[in-house]
């Protein structure tokens, strides 16, 4: 599944490798980045020849979100009617994008199955010292140096809300994911701590 510029670059290798392994693969393009500048990655990686479904999502963030759940869910329903609920179709979404947040939910509603996530387990972290800082506090040289040092020596905590909406998207995506493809061991550790089965999380 591709929708925005980051998707083109992160998902293109999956399409290339699937073809090399002679696995059946096609691209679902949400169409969010469709102009020549933002959409150049589709042409650059020759993804257009693999697009089997173009959802043509447009509008502002709320309009895109609403349209995405309706169209992606409807496509899932169509696939269920055509291929059955035990079909091996497996959408692979990417990272912490809007598509990653909404497509799994829509696919569960439409197809009755979960998805796979590329770049799974992305979680923002902040140093513990952030909790002690006050917005009204005047930044002194000592405070700045302490803040910098704490980033190296201090403990860190998972920040669920920032950046917004990316962190919401990736948390929601995890709940609708069956197979997790994590970029690092830290990302896998995040997912396992959250209760996702170790055997379904691959680094």
Predicted features by range, described:
Residues 112-203:
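Active-site-proximal region of nucleotide-activated glycan assembly enzymes
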Residues 1, 28, 88-90, 93-95, 118:
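Structural motif
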Residues 33, 99, 186-188:
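Alpha-helix capping/helix-boundary segments
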Residues 92-110:
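An aromatic- and histidine-rich active-site surface loop
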Residues 17, 103-108, 172-173:
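Hydrophobic/aromatic ligand-binding patch that stacks against planar heteroaromatic rings
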Residues 4, 97, 184-186:
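Helix N-cap/beta->alpha junction signal
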Residues 1-86:
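Glycosyltransferase specificity loop/lid
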